[in-house]
Design a protein with these regions (language model features):
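Gly/Pro-rich cap/lid or specificity-loop segments adjacent to the active site
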Residues: 4-36, 41-236, 325-365, 370, ...
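Alpha/beta-hydrolase fold active-site neighborhood
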Residues: 231-355
């Protein structure tokens, strides 16, 4: 029996969004078995309502793995004050909502409203979680929500970003069996199945090395600034190496802008009280989620874990001592908690089973039935553009796929130029 957190039913009440639950099988191979509830949010276009069909629906499949839809729009988003700091540094949906409604689904097991797992319970089972909270089940959950929320015959689009690409590919494979097809689906800076795990991880680390060097070019005294942040952390009784959690800020935006944002964030860190620093570290992926660790292994690095891969990439792509290093964060996956340390060590020795995917020929057949846009992104610290283009090649289908490179890093599709590209592509579809 897996441990779950309780979901507050008050999460349904909202003055702007339409929120709800859809019942779904816990195990789609046993539809008559136990069921869980999948939480969704339908966000209206600006100045509209959730039911306004004049604005088509875009289903945004968020990244992770292991993060709920609130990572893309907070549950307590301040609609009256869109520029409020509480809404986060990037409003991923503000451009989409000019013309579309957006449908978000909490992926099962994440810390949201869809059967959230209690990942702080020592009884968690990595193998069971990998099987039952897979990208395949998440794709089927999205289909169940679409069938409930989007009326039959009404066109909709999908954007699968980051880990969402795995869920998106699983969804496309369902269309071979008659699942509702989107009018078009975007795979933006996304993970894709059948990648070489070591090669893609080396590419990711090499891209972050380039971004560190670019940071030093833009901010010549960045080493000194980072040293001050380390001193600040140490003075508060925190591990100065937590500065490596800043890897998520590398390449976060277009060239010439993200570097200034990084420098400004360093200044903020020097003023933050201890509690706020710890929260910033958690919120910006400076700590490892165990759900992410499990699902990342099952989807991205079958037969390995993030930590076993990180040990190899650190040797293959060495860093200078001052540099921001994601691999340090990964090395701390156990968090210093004895049962977590044992859990992660056991996973490293015996990773969970790989998530099954349709074959490449089957996925190409599914792509041939759909309209697909792939968008590599410059400055992407997670899915480097060159690595992504290589991964895309096996899925290119003439007449069905297009590739458009975007500026702006990992969230490029949600920025202004990415949105213009989306509008132009969507408008070109029959």
């Amino acid at each position: 029996m897996l441990p779950y957190k309780k979901v507050d039913p008050a999460v349904l009440a909202h003055p702007v969004e339409r929120r709800g639950f859809v019942d779904a099988p816990f195990d789609y191979a046993r539809p008559e078995g136990p069921r869980i509830r999948i939480f969704y949010r339908l966000i209206p276009a600006h100045g509209s309502t959730p039911g306004d069909s004049a604005h088509p629906v875009v289903v945004v499949i968020n990244g992770g793995p292991g993060y709920p839809s609130s990572a893309y729009r907070p549950l307590d988003y301040d609609y009256a004050n869109p520029d409020s700091p509480k809404n986060g540094p990037i409003d991923r949906l503000k451009h989409l909502l000019k013309s579309y409604r957006v449908l978000l689904v909490d992926q099962r097991g994440t810390d949201g409203g869809s059967a959230p797992l209690d990942m702080e319970d020592p009884s968690i089972d990595a193998n069971e979680i990998a099987r039952s909270f897979s990208s395949d089940s998440q794709a089927r959950d999205h289909l169940a929500v679409i069938e409930e929320v989007v009326p039959g015959g009404e066109p909709f689009f999908m954007i699968a970003q980051s880990y969402g690409g795995m869920v998106g590919m699983q969804y496309l494979s369902l269309t071979l069996a008659g699942a509702r097809r989107p009018k078009g689906i975007v795979f933006s800076a996304s993970a894709l199945p059948y990648e070489d795990a070591l090669a893609s991880s080396v590419g990711r680390r090499a891209e972050q090395l380039k971004l560190n060097l670019r940071l030093r070019e833009a901010i010549p005294d960045v080493e000194g600034r980072l040293a001050k942040v380390r001193e600040r952390l140490k003075s508060l009784g925190l591990n100065p190496d937590q500065v490596h959690g800043l890897y998520s800020f590398l390449g976060k935006g277009v060239t010439g802008v993200w570097e200034k944002g990084f420098a400004a964030h360093l200044e903020k860190l020097l003023e933050m009280p201890k509690e706020e620093l710890e929260k910033s570290n958690r919120d910006n992926f400076g700590t490892v989620s165990l759900l992410n660790y499990i699902l990342s292994s099952a989807n991205f690095t079958p037969g390995e874990t993030d930590r076993t891969i990180a040990k190899r990439t650190s040797e293959l792509v060495p860093y200078e001592p001052w540099m921001i290093d994601e691999n340090w964060v990964i090395s701390q996956a156990g968090g210093g908690v004895p049962w977590r340390e044992n859990f992660v060590a056991a996973m490293d020795k015996r990773p969970p089973p790989a998530t099954p995917f349709a074959s490449v020929p089957e996925l190409r057949a599914a792509i041939a039935l759909n309209s697909v846009l792939f968008t590599p992104a410059d400055n992407d610290a997670y899915v480097p553009a060159e690595t992504y283009v290589e991964a895309i090649a096996k899925f290119e289908v003439p007449g069905s796929t297009r590739i458009q490179r975007l500026p702006g890093g990992h969230s490029a599709i949600f920025l202004e130029e990415g949105h213009r590209a989306f509008l132009a592509w969507a408008g070109s579809l029959a």
